Each structure stands twice: as structure tokens, then as C-alpha cells.
Amino acid sequence: MYQRNILVEQADPEVWAAIQAENLRQEQHIELIASENYASPAVMAAQGSQLTNKYAEGYPGKRYYGGCENVDVVEQLAIDRVKKLFGADAANVQPNSGSQANQAVLLAFLKPGDTILGMSLAEGGHLTHGMPLNMSGKWFNIVSYGLNEKEEIDYDALEAKAREHKPKLIIAGASAYSLRIDFERFAKIAKEVGAIFWVDIAHYAGLVVAGEYPNPVPFADVVTSTTHKSLRGPRGGIILMKAEHEKAINSAIFPGLQGGPLEHVIAAKAVAFKEALTPEFKAYQQQVAKNAKVFAETLIERGLRIISGRTESHVMLVDLRAKGITGKAAEAALGQAHITINKNSIPNDPEKPMVTSGIRVGTPAITTRGFKEEETRITANLLADVLENPNDEANLAAVREKVHALTSRFPVYR
């Protein structure tokens, strides 16, 4: 029997120390990784609840275990809320991650060897959309589409490839593409060749909810997303689908890929979805988009090239070649200045994937902590200051001091 009054700090000082160090890092550092955000205390409290103790294989009202009456309520709330958020016919809130949600789509609609048309990872796609080392690339025949000379999705080439290869499934969505995607045109192409049309909005979901990015639900057969990133919920996944695909998708998740769902995480998803239904969340997403525009404009003023020349979302790719620094080196230097970003390949990148010629920058996290246009402009200039002299310790120290002055004015949890 454990002692009920013993908390983490007494039970495991080593883990507690790491948690506290991470808490300090999140408070002091400026977070610009586009896929990261700060979940609310309410979301984290739900995830830390007693629901973690409950096994609940199956779906609400159709469980293989007894005692599921309370988790049924929670899961149904999550389903109903996410359907309302996106205007979807049906939803599955059980995927443990965005990648598992994506795997479920493949399991529901395809057989090994079927052809998929997806965005090239090298030009902004995601590894679950056909990267050779990923399950999607190992099990299926992958045909990739990419960008044109303007670094925009080449819809004409995409259409030609669809007609030539007759894919069973076409994927829209990206992990490093800053522009709006024409989901309606994708849908027309998919319909012409008889393909299932799947959209992955893991990055854009929060913006979609607020009307700041196109909603693919009216056009797609199935839509997947993570629940963290711009949705600002717990780490996990969701699947939205047309009514006729609900049985296939649900069977692909359980028993196809997963057993008992993580009901404590589903509770946190439900809380996050309720938050996302508020006017405050819409205003937050509007500010995310405004901040991204300011960030990109400021970097351009400082002599940096933005891939595609602009952003129409929360994210941007920055080409560092003119500065003579790799993405890997930039990530390290910015980290020393307490600005967190990730290295990222750019289209036709001459560097290896673990080195890269670019960085990816996003505004969801800084907007959550309260940054508006003024603070965003300051942050973009601080980032540019580091890139001007990445090996100058005095420069890094000066930027770090300015970062701390800024973050102390906008605490996350304190």
C-alpha cells in the first residue's frame, strides 16, 4: 500500500528535480517551436486525474469492462465537442497520438502495396505521409508531390500525378508549410481519380477552429489532427470523418491499433475542446496569426529569407544560407540565448536532415503567454541578433538577458 500523502517530491526527488528544471526552462525561455504550446492548468489537472486508473476497451456504451459509466460520460463529451468545433459528422477521440491517428486511416482504407499520393517530406510534408523509414513508406507505394518555383504547392503537377498513378488515397497537410492549402481543389482531384481524400491538420487545427485557416471537413473523407500544438490541449490525436467511414475508422483504432484508451487524456481533450469553443480561444488564434505575420515581416527586414516569401498561418520556414549558418548551429546558438526553435530542412536543401539549412518558427506558444505584435517584433529581432553573431558569447549573453526580461513580464504558470 502506498502512502497517500507522499507526492512526487518525496517519492522520487530525481524526477521531481527534472520537472522543476523544465518548469523553470518553460518560464524563462522563449518557445518558438511551432508544434509546442502550453496546456492550461485545467487541461493538466484532468490529465492527472483518477481516470488514469480505468480500463475502458471499446467505445461509450459498448465496453468490454464494467465500471465505465463515468468514463463514458467524459469520452462522449469529448466526441460531441470536437464534432461541434469542426462541423464533423463523426469523431474518434481515442488515438494516443497524431501518428497513431494517421496509422488508423491507412489501416481503415488501404492494403499493403496500395498507392498513396502525399506531400514530400523534403518540401514540407510529414514522415507519416510516406517517408521511406516510416510504416507508411514501408507498407505502401508512395508517390510524392511538392512545390513549384514560387515554393507553393504545385497543384497542376499534383493533378497530373494523380491521373497518372491513380492513388487509392491522397493526403493533404504538412508539418512545415506556411501557406493556406486549397482543400477544395484537392477534393476535386481525389474525386476525379476515385481516391479517398485525407487531410492532416495537426499543425493548423486551432487556426481552423477560429476561422483563421480553411476548414477541410466539408471536403475530406477523413481529417486527422493532434490535440496539442495550436489546439493547446494534451498530447494526443483525433480523427474526424464522414458518417459512412465511422465504422471503418473506429474498428481501425480499436481493436486494430490500440487496446484500452487513455481516458485521463481523453478527459483533458474534452476540457481543451470546451476551451476551444470560447470567444477567447478565437481571439487567441487571431493573435497567433497576427504575430506570425509580424514575425515573418521582421525577419525579412533583417535580411532573412522566408520560404514561400510569407506565412498564412502560425508557422514559417527560415532559409539561413545567406547568413552562412546551418539550422543545427542556429538551434544551438539560439538555445544558449534561451530562444527555443528547431532546425528544419528547406526545399532542395543541400544539407543533411540532421544539419539542415533552415529553422522552423511558430507563434502559438508565445501568444499563449501573452505576446502581441510589439513583443513578437522584439522576439524576432532578438532571434536575428543571435544569427548575426552566433559565436559571440557576449552577444548571446546580452540576448539572453533581454529574453529573461521579456519572459518575466509574461509568466506561463506562475
Curated annotation (Swiss-Prot):
The record marks 228 as: Plays an important role in substrate specificity. The keyword Cytoplasm applies. One of its GO terms (cellular component) is cytosol. The modification N6-(pyridoxal phosphate)lysine is found at residue 229. Its EC number is 2.1.2.1. Keywords: Amino-acid biosynthesis, Cytoplasm, One-carbon metabolism, Pyridoxal phosphate, Transferase. It is found in: Cytoplasm. (6S)-5,6,7,8-tetrahydrofolate binds at residues 121, 125-127. It is an enzyme of class 2 (transferase). GO terms for molecular function: glycine hydroxymethyltransferase activity; pyridoxal phosphate binding. It holds the Pfam family SHMT. Gene3D superfamilies: Aspartate Aminotransferase, domain 1, Type I PLP-dependent aspartate aminotransferase-like (Major domain). Pathway: One-carbon metabolism; tetrahydrofolate interconversion; Amino-acid biosynthesis; glycine biosynthesis; glycine from L-serine: step 1/1. InterPro entries: PyrdxlP-dep_Trfase (IPR015424), PyrdxlP-dep_Trfase_major (IPR015421), PyrdxlP-dep_Trfase_small (IPR015422), Ser_HO-MeTrfase (IPR001085), Ser_HO-MeTrfase-like (IPR049943), Ser_HO-MeTrfase_PLP_BS (IPR019798), SHMT-like_dom (IPR039429). Disulfide bonds: none annotated. Its cofactor is pyridoxal 5'-phosphate. It catalyses: (6R)-5,10-methylene-5,6,7,8-tetrahydrofolate + glycine + H2O = (6S)-5,6,7,8-tetrahydrofolate + L-serine. CDD domains: SHMT (cd00378). Homodimer. Catalyzes the reversible interconversion of serine and glycine with tetrahydrofolate (THF) serving as the one-carbon carrier. This reaction serves as the major source of one-carbon groups required for the biosynthesis of purines, thymidylate, methionine, and other important biomolecules. Also exhibits THF-independent aldolase activity toward beta-hydroxyamino acids, producing glycine and aldehydes, via a retro-aldol mechanism. Belongs to the SHMT family. HAMAP family: SHMT (MF_00051). This is Serine hydroxymethyltransferase. It comes from Paracidovorax citrulli (strain AAC00-1). The lineage of its organism: Bacteria, Pseudomonadati, Pseudomonadota, Betaproteobacteria, Burkholderiales.
